[in-house]
Structures are given as C-alpha cells and as structure tokens.
Amino acid sequence: RKYVGEYKDGERNGQGTFTSSDGGKYEGEYKDGEYQGQGTLTFGKGEWEDQKYVEEYKDGLPNGQGTITYPNGRKYVGEYKDGERNGQGTLTWSNGKKYVGEWKDGEMSGQGTKTWTNGDMYEGEFKDGKYDGQGTYTWSDGRKYVGEWKDGETKRSWYCHFTLLEVCRGMEGE
C-alpha cells in the first residue's frame, strides 16, 4: 500500500495517488483522508478487477456525474448518490444493448428506454430493474405491445389488431 500526495493535519488532503496491495489505484482529490471531489478509481485484482470509475466523490463514495467502465465491456455514464446509480443515466452493454433513463438505488427505476441491436425497444416505466407500470414494447418487425407491466411481465392478456402495423394491447383477463 502506498500513498503519494498532499497531507494536512496528518490526513490525506488535496491531490494524491493511493495504490493498494491488490493493484487498485485512486488518483484525485482527498479531504480529511476520504476521496472527495474529482478523481479516478481503478479496481485491482478480485471481483471488481479492472473496473474504472471517473469523476466526483463525496465522503469516499461516488457522488454526482460519473462514468464507470466494467471489465465485461459494460459502461455506465450518469448520476450517482452515496455510491449508487441514482438519477439520470445510460448503461450500455458490450453487445450493444442500451438503457437510457432514471435510476434509483442502483436499479433501473422510473421512466426509461431499453433498446436492443436487433431493433427491439421497450419504452416506459421500470421498477427495480424490471418493466413495471405503463410501457410499450416494439419488436423490430413493427409489432407492438402497449399496456401495463408488473415485475417484467405483461399484467394482462393480450389482444392484437392486425393492420399494416400489428398492435397488441393489454386487456382484462378472464
């Protein structure tokens, strides 16, 4: 473990670089020994290996706008509060799938849009990472389901109206 940087009253304060024994590294601002302000945290060996978080910290946790890049190719750009994804943000998977919308406590929650590389798209409400509330799922061939969702599933049975554009709507099941 090694720290190179500024100290004040025996604490890390100001600019500095801390390297941990597992190869992790934080480069940025410190206040009273905690990550505070602008900085880049690169994780070392282990579960979070090679993940990188860039931007703002408060009390040692990601806060404000930030970017985190995961070793599996996923990337999140957006708001953090107390170390969790909170507010507006975009998560892009390595396969090109993308979510743009609201986050709460690290989960997709609120209004958002999820798109797939094949052209499929869900637009609507999310809760705890799942479709929940009013939403529209559009398939790449133009078919649509418009209706209510609960825990990632359609809440009601479907009916479809066949026209040039097939539209399926939720209706009360029997």
Residue ranges and their predicted role:
Residues 18-22, 41-44, 68-71, 91-93, ...:
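Beta-turn initiation residues at beta-strand->coil junctions
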Residues 2-13, 25-36, 48-63, 75-86, ...:
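Conserved anchor residues at repeat-unit boundaries in beta-strand-based tandem repeats, strongest
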